């Protein structure tokens, strides 16, 4: 088995998180409870790639997608560990953390950070997305709803 996949599975089991391995693949499916929502997640681990994606549990209505796309683009500027993305066709919003790594053992601290970051970022920026969808806020002003963005992290 691939070190990246094996280490990820061992880490998830050690901390007691439930996951489902997609049969005959290097994909793990799980959910992570953030402060505001529970986020469906996928982890792909096959050297040299390790990718974790968390998704908002609701879709962006078609009428709001351009404004949300601008919001996500503005939010992405300066992020160090991952990025937001949106599917224009169905309104799915996700955050992705990824690394390219040799097939060698992974430290738990790295796994912890790269697995938790996508859900944490969705938690931090979801209020701005909701302000656009519910209140008609514009992207530039919606960033003020994110404490992380205001702090410049």
Predicted regions and their residues:
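Amphipathic alpha-helical segments
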Residues: 1-18
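Short glycine-/aliphatic-rich beta-strand segments at the starts of folded cytosolic domains
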Residues: 50-58
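Short, internal acidic amphipathic alpha-helical interface segments
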Residues: 58-92
């Amino acid at each position: 088995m691939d070190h990246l996949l094996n280490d990820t599975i061992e880490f998830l089991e050690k901390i007691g998180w439930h996951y489902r391995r997609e049969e005959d693949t290097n994909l793990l499916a799980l959910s992570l409870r953030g402060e505001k929502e529970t986020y469906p997640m996928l982890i792909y681990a096959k050297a040299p790639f390790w990718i974790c994606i968390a998704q908002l549990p609701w879709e962006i209505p078609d009428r709001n997608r351009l404004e949300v796309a601008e919001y996500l683009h503005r939010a992405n500027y300066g992020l160090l560990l991952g990025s937001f993305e949106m599917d224009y066709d169905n309104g799915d919003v996700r955050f992705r953390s990824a690394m390219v790594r040799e097939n060698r053992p992974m430290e738990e601290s790295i796994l912890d950070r790269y697995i938790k970051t996508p859900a944490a970022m969705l938690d931090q920026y979801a209020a701005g997305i909701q302000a656009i969808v519910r209140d008609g806020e514009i992207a530039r002003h919606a960033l003020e709803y994110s404490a992380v963005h205001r702090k410049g992290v």
